[in-house]
Every structure is written in structure tokens, then in C-alpha cells.
Amino acid sequence: MSVPQSKTWLVDGFCRFTTRMVRKSFQCFAVQGLDQIPSIAASNCSLVVYANHIGWWDPIVAMLLRKKYLPDRVFYAPIDAKALEAYGVFRQLGFYGLKLETFAGASDFLKTSREILSDPKSSVWITPEGVFCDCRDLEQPFMPGLAHLAATTPNTIFVPLAIEYPFWQEPKPMIATRFGEPLSFQAGASKADCGKKIFESLRDTQRHLASSVMRRDFSEFDFVVAPKSQRLGLYDNLRAWKAWLQGRPFDPSHASINGKDSTSPGQRN
């Protein structure tokens, strides 16, 4: 398998399109762990970001995070080979086929990934669980490919990424993400040791994100897409009319019904 193309202009154009999709489908796109980004961006090492795998939106989340926070990194991501055949344009976006159910497929994945990561400006975004999992399932084992990769690419930084799609007060869910502590592995590191550290680091990152999600506090996050409340037809029009009669501004957020502060925050420092 040859190294896939990743045309930056096409990836960025796709990101502009999917940002509109996110705005339409989600209340906001929130992120934590940005204190890790400056050292990662400045590093002369290639990058692997590995995330839990909840559903269809995960690759879009990865692409938008790369564009927003790591724009100088070239985007690559393994994807099921059958899906890649169905959506051939993805080959131009840095996606490459994955057939881990066979020895030859696993070997191709490792060979292609190593070739990609030989470029210090590259980034591979991967979901090592291999199947869709609930974000609270912290026991699902990882497929072995990532541990093999970590043990054989010493000049690469590995960064865990936790993802959730929770509902808060609004009718649409939010995207909640968190970057964890970067890892690197010395030449000669054992596959077992790499696999253990990678697994534990992602699960710890998921736990931290889950705690924040359950607190429902926007001030704990930065935003790729900031929160925005929307009116819901007749019900919210009546609420707006009532607010006008009472001489107060109308807050369309449903948190305001319970007397909670629901103002959309700006970026945190």
C-alpha cells in the first residue's frame, strides 16, 4: 500500500463544509487540554492522536481539531477499506484503507503508517478500539496495531483524545473533547509496555472529560464552535413575548428556565 495523498487545500475545504454541518447538528464543539498543544506543534516529531470511537462523527471531529489547533500537521487517518472503496474522494483527504482482520492487512497498516510518520510534519488520527463503543465503556480492549506502531516509531508523539456527544439543557447535543498528556517511546520499548501506557492514558483522559461533562459547566472548556441557543417555534416565541412584557431581555437557552447562567462563554485563556 502506497502512502495516501493528503491535499491540504481539499482537507481545509472539507473542514469548512463540515463546520457548517456541526453548527447545524450540535449546540457547540468544546475542547479541553489545549495546554498540550504548543509543545506538540513546536515538536520536530511526527504525531499520532488516538481517540475512543463513539460513532460516525469521529473522523470529522478529528479533522476539525487538526485544522483549528495543529494546522501545520498533514492529516492522515486509517479507515475501513470497504468504506474507502465506497467514498473514493477520501483518498485525497489523507484516509487509507484498513483490513486488520487479516495478517496481510495488519502488515500493510503498519508499513503505511510508518512511512507516513517518517515525515515529522505528519499526523495520524486513529481509533484503536476498532468498533463503535459507548464513551463510558472503559474496558473495551484496543486492537494491537497501535501498540506495534508505538514500539517501532521512536520519533513520534502519541496523544490521547477523549470524545463524547452529550446532551445538556438544549435540544441538540454538544461535541465534548479533551487532549490528554502526550507520550513518547524509546527505541526498543516493548509492545506490551507501549500498549499498556496507551490504553491507560486514553482511559484516564476519558475519565477527566466525563467528570467535566457531568458538571455541565461551559467555563471548563474552550470552543471550536461556540455555544448558541436557538428558539424552538411557538414555545420560545411565547417565552420571548413574556420577557418583553416583563421588560427584560429574552434568553433562548433552556438553562435559563431553571435560573442557571447560560450565557455563551468566550475563549478561556
Which residues make up each language-model segment?
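A conditional alpha-helix N-cap/helix-loop micro-motif detector
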Residues: 27-30, 103-107, 139-140
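A transmembrane-helix-recognition feature enriched in membrane-embedded lipid enzymes
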Residues: 1-33, 60-61, 88-92
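Short glycine/serine/proline-enriched coil/turn segments at secondary-structure junctions
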Residues: 39-40, 87, 167-171
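Conserved beta-strand scaffold positions in the cores of enzyme catalytic domains, especially
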Residues: 31, 77, 95-97, 158, ...
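Catalytic core of membrane glycerolipid acyltransferases/transacylases, capturing the structured
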Residues: 41-103
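Structural motif corresponding to alpha-helix initiation and N-cap regions
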Residues: 31-34, 83, 107-110
